[in-house]
């Protein structure tokens, strides 16, 4: 691995042609194994104007093609238990501290319902199906609770009855619980850091950023791929975004969901303006510069924030996306997503994890 240095310019050229050349040179170095520094990543945030941001996206797309190929990882999710969550995440409408106006409340869905939705997701083209539950996490469940056993049984059913790989997002968990999920058939688990370590206390106080990191480490120790990302548009600074991406690089996660905050009424962040689509594109592209081999996943908010520009994200470094509906909001149809991929010369399927891609 080529070691990082500060030899590259840290201020992008203002001239369009010079900027394009500078970005392509940096992209080529990253493709060859160079790890971009924080100073260089921050310099990319100084690029301004739609035309020049698109040049940044073009360079990020070159990195994606060289390091990941043209296959777009497709997954779908199901909210298996919703509402009355004990945590106070400012962005989430499922919190008991500030329930959103459009957040459903229900207990654990039946195994049959979950398996049927897994089959439907597979039929729609998804290759992975993630079981998502509210709450701080499995490690805090009562010893008398049967929920984990029910989830394990459902995961096993999905592996045998549906042509799709089961994933889970069940909050914090112990190493032993991670090992049990692995044995049941879970190969990837979603547990986002959400934000940088510095910004995190401004959006959540009922648990810590370090708590979340511990779970990611437990997943990796159990041999489960970490699907770990965050949210853009919560009022964080560019430096916060860079720090988040660098933390994900340090943790060597496999898949990185990039959520674009779609402010929900009733939540503490409900008053925030929606993120500018070109700022979102810039963030996506910079994440690709920092995380050249990781799966970068369009997650919540892509339709609401990107609108007609969402296809540009797939030319800015994205090589994965959720299809179908989200936890408490609706997404566009899988057929629309498949048509979008085809128009861009991309194919849905399973994208390679870091170190797997062979050109």
Curated annotation (Swiss-Prot):
CDD domains found in the cross-reference section: Radical_SAM
Positions bound to [4Fe-4S] cluster: 85, 89, 92
One Pfam family recorded for the sequence: BATS
EC top class named in words: transferase
Amino acids binding [2Fe-2S] cluster: 130, 167, 227, 297
A GO molecular-function annotation: biotin synthase activity
Role noted for this protein: Catalyzes the conversion of dethiobiotin (DTB) to biotin by the insertion of a sulfur atom into dethiobiotin via a radical-based mechanism.
Protein name as catalogued: Biotin synthase
Organism: Gloeothece citriformis (strain PCC 7424) (Cyanothece sp. (strain PCC 7424))
């Amino acid at each position: 691995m080529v070691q990082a240095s500060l030899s590259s310019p840290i201020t992008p050229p203002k001239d369009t042609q010079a900027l394009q050349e500078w970005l392509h040179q940096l992209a080529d170095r990253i493709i060859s194994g160079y790890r971009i520094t924080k100073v260089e990543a921050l310099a990319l945030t100084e690029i301004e104007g739609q035309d020049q941001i698109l040049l940044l996206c073009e360079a990020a797309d070159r990195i994606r093609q060289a390091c990941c190929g043209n296959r777009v990882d497709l997954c779908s999710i199901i909210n298996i238990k919703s509402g009355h969550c004990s945590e106070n995440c400012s962005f989430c409408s499922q919190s008991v501290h500030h329930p959103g106006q459009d957040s459903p409340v229900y207990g654990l869905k039946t195994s049959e319902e979950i398996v049927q939705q897994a089959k439907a997701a597979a039929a729609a083209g998804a290759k992975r199906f993630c079981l998502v539950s509210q709450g701080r996490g499995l490690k805090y469940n009562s010893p008398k609770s049967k929920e984990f056993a029910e989830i394990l049984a459902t995961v096993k059913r999905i592996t045998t009855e549906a042509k799709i790989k089961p994933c889970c997002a069940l909050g914090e968990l112990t190493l032993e619980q991670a090992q049990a999920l692995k044995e049941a058939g879970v190969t990837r688990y979603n547990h986002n850091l959400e934000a940088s370590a510095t910004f995190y206390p401004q959006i959540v106080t009922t648990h810590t950023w370090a708590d979340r990191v511990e779970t990611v480490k437990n997943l990796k120790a159990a041999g489960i791929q970490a699907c770990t990302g965050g949210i853009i548009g919560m009022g964080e600074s560019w430096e916060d975004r860079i720090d988040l991406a660098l933390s994900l690089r340090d943790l060597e996660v496999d898949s990185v969901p990039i959520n674009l905050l779609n402010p929900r009424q009733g939540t503490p962040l409900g008053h925030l303006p929606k993120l500018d689509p070109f700022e979102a594109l810039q963030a996506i592209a910079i994440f690709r510069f920092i995380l050249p081999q990781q799966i970068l996943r369009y997650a919540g908010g892509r339709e609401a924030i990107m609108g007609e520009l969402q296809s540009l994200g797939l030319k800015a470094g994205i090589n994965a996306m959720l299809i179908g509906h989200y936890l408490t909001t609706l997404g566009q149809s899988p057929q629309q997503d498949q048509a979008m991929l085809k128009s861009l010369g991309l194919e849905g399927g399973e994208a390679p994890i870091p170190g797997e891609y062979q050109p």
